[in-house]
């Protein structure tokens, strides 16, 4: 009985450490999101402006430039966040175990955050073309759907923070594939329509 009780308390302590580590890491993670979102909003704005005046070749250039900008920004900021992670995490906690846990989370989220930027840019471009419904559904399926499947079917067999947070880049990759396919067909349809009207 005492053994079970101490084991239960140990599990609670581990969960508290994991939650504190995630909370601290998520604060750093938020700064990266602001950068990615700024590039996505720029992509959407410039795409919609060019779409409005029928400059469809410029829309491709906008997306390519934004993909490059997002990639470069996230490689610099994401890797810097991980490199300076131990120091940055001390802003939020002094517990060494929480910092270690936060670093595990940062490894799978900040270093690969350029994937999240790519995932957001294709829907941003599609919204600029007046198509928002399908990209929204694909984003929900790709991110939320993948993580739900991951938590219920993969995580129970390999219960560790590493396996749990690999679901982030995995869901981003799946969503990117879905969004690129959607972008290809929408672009093809819109460009055919624009050529017919020209």
What is each PLM-predicted segment?
Residues 47-112, 154-198:
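Short alpha-helical transmembrane segments in multi-pass integral membrane proteins
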Residues 11-30, 97-103, 131, 166:
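Interfacial/gating helices of multi-pass transporter permease domains
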Residues 1-13:
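Single conserved hydrophobic/aromatic residue that forms the stacking wall/gate
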Residues 21-79, 83-85, 116-138:
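Small-residue-rich hydrophobic transmembrane alpha-helices
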Residues 109, 139-140:
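Short, contiguous acidic/charged loop-to-helix segments that flank catalytic cores in large enzymes
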Residues 6-7, 44, 128, 150, ...:
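Tryptophan-centric aromatic hotspots in well-structured domains and transmembrane helices
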Residues 26-29, 73, 141-146, 171-175:
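Transmembrane alpha-helical core residues of multi-pass small-molecule transporters
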Residues 145-155:
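Transmembrane alpha-helical segments of integral membrane proteins
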